[in-house]
Amino acid sequence: MKEFFATCPKGLENLLAVELTNLGAEQVRETVAGVHFKGELAIGYKACLWSRFASRIVLVLSEFQMNDDLDLYLGAHTIPWEEHFSGTSTIAVDFTGTNPAIRNTQYGALKIKDAIVDRFTKRGHVRPDVDKKSPDIRIMAHLGKGKANITLDLSGPALHQRFYRQGTGEAPLKENLAAAMIARSGWAGEPMMDPMCGSGTLLVEAAFIAADMAPALRRERFGFDRWLQHDSELWQSLLMEAQVRAKRGMQRCEVKLFGCDADSRVLLKARDNAKAAGVAHLITFKQADVTALENPLPMPAPVEGEEGQGEARQVGMLISNPPYGERLGEFPALLEVHQALGDALRRSFQGWKVSILSASPELLSCLRLRADKQYRLFNGALECQLRNYQIAQDSVASQKEVAQDFANRLRKNLKTLEKWAQKENLDCYRLYDADLPEYNAAIDRYQDYLVVQEYAAPKDIPAQKTRQRLLDMVQAAIKVTGMDGEKVILKVRERQEGKQQYQKLSEEQHRMEVQEYGARLWVNLYDYLDTGLFLDHRQTRRMLGQMAKGKRFLNLFAYTGSATVHAGLGGASETTTVDMSRTYLNWAQDNMRLNSLVGREHKFVQADCLKWLSEADDQYDLIFIDPPTFSNSKRMDESFDVQRDHLLLMQHLKRLLAAGGTLVFSNNKRHFKMDLAGLEAIGLKAQNITGKTRPKDFERNQHIHNCWIITHAEAQA
C-alpha cells in the first residue's frame, strides 16, 4: 500500500476523512487541515477524481528527522527521484515550515532542488529544469516538529478548482468549502435556494452532488500526468466509470435549484458558470434583492369542494454565504441585509431548513433565529460559523423592535430636532448623544447620512455584549430614521476630553457639501474619525460671523477653517487661519473657496500654534481659539494641557488682541476652571458664555464644551 495525505481547509477534516473512507481508503487519520490515509494507487486516483472536500492529494515519498540543512539535503538525496520522473521533466519545489537552520522557505526549497539535481547529475542523467508556474512534477515538502516530510503532488492545480468558472463576483466561495456547507446543512436533494448566490458556486456544487458528477471530471490536467509510475490504463478505467455515472445521474436528476442576487452582472457570470459546468438546466437564476425575497416554490392549488388549502406546500433548503464585511464601517448595510433575510424567512419560508455561513456572530444574531446546530469552518484564514436553522410552520415576520428603549428615545429626539433643524435651515445635527447609558454612542445626521460613533465601553463590560448593543443601535437607527443602510457610517472612538488628535481612518476621499447658516462647508464622513465639522460649535461660529464685520480675524487651532468661513461671510476685513496640519489647512482653503472667499486678505499658516503665538506680533480685532484638551504631537516641541497652560496661552493672546478687541476661547475639558485671578493679573477679563453657544441638539450634554469671551480689562471697566 502507498501512503497519501489529503490537505483541506480547517474545519473540513472530518468530512474529508469520512469521504476517503467511503472511497476505500485505509488507516484514515485526521490532523489539522488534512487527513493521512493509505491504499493502493487506485485509491489515490479516486481521491483526486471524487473528493469534494480536499485541496490536494499528495503521495508521501519520505519522512525523516531533520536538524539542519545537511539533514534536509541528504534526506532528499536518498529518494529515488529517477523512478518518479525523467530529466526531461520540469519540476517545482514548494516548501513550508522553518527551524533555526532553515530560516526561510525559499532556502528549504533550494536545498531539496539541489539534492534532486545532484542525484540526476551523479547518475549521468539529464538534470531536470525548474518551472515554478506550470511544472510537470510538483514536489511538496513540510518541516515541523523536527521532521521533514517530502511528497509528490498528484493533484496539479488545487482540487477546489472545478474548471467551470467563467468569472466571479467579489470574494468567491471556494468549491470545497461550498461542498462542506452543503454536507453540513443536511441537504438531501430537496429544492434548494441561495438568495445571495453571487457566482453560483453553492448551486453548481449542489447540482454536481445531485447528478453524481465527480468534481474533477472536467479537469484536463493532473499532477500525475508525467509521473513515471502513473498507471494510465487504471486511470482511464476510473475516469470512464465516473463519466458513465455522471451521464446516468444527469439523466435522472430532477433537483430544483434557485439562485438570486441583486447584482445583474454577477448573475450573468453565475449563468455562464452553470452553463460551463453542464448544469444550467437544473438552476433557475433571478435578479432579486434579499429585502424582496420570495419563496420560489408554488403554492398548492386548493382542492375543489373542500375547505382549506389542500395539500401542504413543498418545503426546501435555503443555504447561503452572505457578505459579512471585514471592516466595521461595512456593518450597517449588512445589518439591514441580515435583518431583511430573517424577516423574509419567517414570512415566506415556513417549514424550510436554513443554513448560513458567516464570520460574524453579530450579523447572524440579526436573523433573530435560533440555531439547531453550529459548525466551525474556515473561509481561507477567516474563522466562520455555519449555523443550521429550522423555520417553524407557523412562523411570522417578527414585529418586535430591536433595542426598544433606544428606538423610543431616538424617535422622540428625531421628532423634536427634525422640526428645529428645518426651521434653522440646518442639514447636519446631533440626534443622540449617549442619552441612555447602555447605548453608549453619538449619532449625527448629515443630510441623508447617519454617522454613528461608539464611545469606548468600560473595561468590565464584555466586548461581545458591547458589540451587540452597537449593532442593535444601528439596526434601530436605520428603522427609526428610514435611512438607507448604505448611508450609515459606523465608527468607534474613545470618549475624549477634547479634540486630542485628528485621526485618519483610510486613504480614500469621500467629501460632501453641507450648509450651516448660509455657509457652505465640506465634510468627510468616512475617512477620518471626525468629519471636519464640530457640530457643538455651530452657535459659536454663527456668533463669530455676526461679530466679524470690518474686523481682523485670527483662527488658531483652526482645523478645517469653518469658523474662518463664517467670519469671512460676516464681513471680516482680513482673516488668518493657523493649524499644524497641512491636510486640514488645505481643507480650510477649500472651504473658503467654496464660499468665494479668496484673495490676499485671507492667509493660511501651517505652524505649531503655540510656537507661532510666541513669535507673532500682528494685531487682531477678533480671535477664536479652540485648543485641544491635551496634545503631545511629534511636531510640537512640548506637550500642552489646557488646564495647566491656559494662562500662558492668554499672555500671548493678550499681546495680539487689539485694543477693544474680543477673544473667544473654547475648550472641551470637562470641569475646566478658568484662572480668573490670573487673568486679572495680566489685564484680561472673562465672561462665560457656554449657555449661549451650546446648541439645541447638544442641550443634553452640559459638558460638550465651555466657551468664554475675553477682553482687555480696561475695555470692561
Swiss-Prot record:
Subcellular locations according to the entry: Cytoplasm
Gene3D superfamilies, sorted: 3.30.2130.30, RNA methyltransferase domain (HRMD) like, Vaccinia Virus protein VP39
Gene Ontology MF term list: 23S rRNA (guanine(2445)-N(2))-methyltransferase activity; RNA binding; rRNA (guanine-N7-)-methyltransferase activity
Catalytic activity reported: guanosine(2445) in 23S rRNA + S-adenosyl-L-methionine = N(2)-methylguanosine(2445) in 23S rRNA + S-adenosyl-L-homocysteine + H(+); guanosine(2069) in 23S rRNA + S-adenosyl-L-methionine = N(2)-methylguanosine(2069) in 23S rRNA + S-adenosyl-L-homocysteine + H(+)
Lineage top rank: taxon: Bacteria
Pfam families: Methyltrans_SAM, RlmL_1st, THUMP, UPF0020
Record has Transferase as a keyword: yes
Keywords, sorted A to Z: Cytoplasm, Methyltransferase, RNA-binding, rRNA processing, S-adenosyl-L-methionine, Transferase
E.C. code: 2.1.1.173, 2.1.1.264
Function as written in the Swiss-Prot or TrEMBL entry: Specifically methylates the guanine in position 2445 (m2G2445) and the guanine in position 2069 (m7G2069) of 23S rRNA.
Similarity comment: Belongs to the methyltransferase superfamily. RlmKL family.
The protein's name in its UniProt record: Ribosomal RNA large subunit methyltransferase K/L
Organism: Aeromonas hydrophila subsp. hydrophila (strain ATCC 7966 / DSM 30187 / BCRC 13018 / CCUG 14551 / JCM 1027 / KCTC 2358 / NCIMB 9240 / NCTC 8049)
